[in-house]
Curated annotation (Swiss-Prot):
Residues passing through the membrane, by range: none
InterPro entries on file: Ribosomal_uL18_bac-type (IPR004389), Ribosomal_uL18_bac/euk (IPR005484)
Any one annotated GO CC term: cytosolic large ribosomal subunit
Protein name in UniProt: Large ribosomal subunit protein uL18
Cited function: This is one of the proteins that bind and probably mediate the attachment of the 5S RNA into the large ribosomal subunit, where it forms part of the central protuberance.
A GO biological-process term: translation
GO molecular function, one term: 5S rRNA binding
Length: 117
């Protein structure tokens, strides 16, 4: 099993548990250059809010989009957008990535901005 397959296996296991609980998810995906976050409804078919370093408003404020500072900006933006839609409580879906570095920075910023998980 290669690195990507192992990550996807971890992600599938976590998502199955969140589906059983019927939780709204804060999903994170990272690439070497960008980081993406989406708040997905409990039914799994509706994206309630999204933010990423690809967006012009966020990327213009950053020097580089692949570091912890960028993840912090995305975490703050996703929390503000989710709260504006009436979502306070979410389950953090790290998509099989380690809770470290950029993923942890995004989660911390989202918590500081008012999301609860």
């Amino acid at each position: 099993m290669d690195k990507k397959a192992a990550r996807l296996r971890r992600a599938t296991r976590a998502r199955k548990k969140m589906q059983e609980l019927g939780a709204t998810r804060l999903v994170v995906h990272r690439t070497p250059r960008h980081i993406y976050a989406q708040v997905i409804a409990a039914n799994g078919s509706e994206v309630l809010a999204s933010a990423s370093t690809v967006e012009k408003a966020i990327s213009e404020a950053l020097k580089y989009s692949g570091n912890a500072d960028a993840a912090t900006a995305v975490g703050k933006a996703i929390a503000e957008r989710a709260i504006a839609k009436g979502v306070q409580n979410v389950s953090f879906d790290r998509s099989g990535f380690k809770y470290h570095g950029r993923v942890a920075a995004l989660a911390t910023a989202a918590r500081d901005a008012g999301l609860q998980f």
